[in-house]
């Protein structure tokens, strides 16, 4: 398991970030890697919202940070986040996915969720440059329509 090389994705990419990072991202014209070897993206707005529902929207849930330390997600504050719709500029770097590593006896439901999670995010090894004027979605606007959001993030009861 672990990293697997993939083909360069075609078309638009999406990246969620805290608003406090937006000014420097727009000024630099790139998404910079953060304490990791990769920068992470999704193929659609729906994938972005689903990824967020499995990560930053999980207040109190445990996760391992880029340095391998166990952390807990803080309270999710929608006003603090935006999603960028990016048109990547030519890059010659390597694209990867990270396949979640599980013990052999993991339940099928855990395996299915790990498979979904692994394929929601696309990693780029390096800083990804993008063309000017990306579309910026306010998280509060995306979450305003509960029924639409539920269908976008594939929550099943």
Regions of interest found by a model, annotated:
Residues 112-121, 125-147:
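SIR2/sirtuin-family catalytic core signature
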Residues 19, 45-48, 89-92:
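Short, charged/polar surface micro-motifs in flexible loops or helix N-caps
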Residues 43-69, 126, 132:
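Generic detector of solvent-exposed, compositionally biased contiguous segments
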Residues 153-157:
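Conserved small/polar residues in nucleotide/adenosyl-binding loops
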Residues 20-37, 91-117:
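Surface-exposed flexible segments
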Residues 28, 85-87, 123, 131:
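A structural detector for beta-sheet-dominated domains
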């Amino acid at each position: 398991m672990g990293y697997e090389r993939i083909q360069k994705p075609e078309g638009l990419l999406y990246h969620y970030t805290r608003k406090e990072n937006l000014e420097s991202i727009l000024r630099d014209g790139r998404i910079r890697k953060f304490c990791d070897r990769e920068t992470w993206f999704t193929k659609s707005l729906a994938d972005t919202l689903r990824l967020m529902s499995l990560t930053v929207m999980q207040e109190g849930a445990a996760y391992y940070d880029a340095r391998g330390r166990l952390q807990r997600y803080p309270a999710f504050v929608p006003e603090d986040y935006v999603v960028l719709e990016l048109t990547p500029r030519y890059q010659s770097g390597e694209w990867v996915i990270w396949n979640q590593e599980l013990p052999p006896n993991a339940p099928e439901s855990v395996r299915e969720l790990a498979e979904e999670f692994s394929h929601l995010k696309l990693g780029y090894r390096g800083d990804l440059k993008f063309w000017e004027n990306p579309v910026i979605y306010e998280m509060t606007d995306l979450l305003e329509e509960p029924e639409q959001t539920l269908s976008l993030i594939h929550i099943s009861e």
